[in-house]
Amino acid sequence: LTILIGINDTWRRFDSNVISKPEDFKACYKRILDKTLEKLSPTLVLMDPFVLPVPEDRRMWREDLDARINIVRELAKEYKAFYVPLDGLFHQAAATTPYEYWCPDGVHPTLAGHGLIAKAWLETVLGK
């Protein structure tokens, strides 16, 4: 079971002033994981939310998103899940290629962005 959540909480803060506290995000994420594990025995793959600075105002999203990324990292350890560090991977990829190539709005991946995610997932989970 692969989970990638968190960026919409950040987005709502900046477009609608709907604030989701990091501790609430963590509690909700843990409920999702716990309820899933009560019913199933999946291999868990947690991917951190990400944002690229496109448009430029996305830079200020870091103040909200970084806490969520840290929470996902902590939960991956706590639940012994595979962890795919998408935020770092996208920023690393964007060091040599324009941000828009990966995510034209900083959040929603292009075909190339989806390819980056798929490659990272395969390398993390299957070692390929």
Question: In which residue ranges do the predicted regions lie?
Answer:
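Alpha-helical cap/lid subdomain in secreted, periplasmic
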Residues: L1-K128
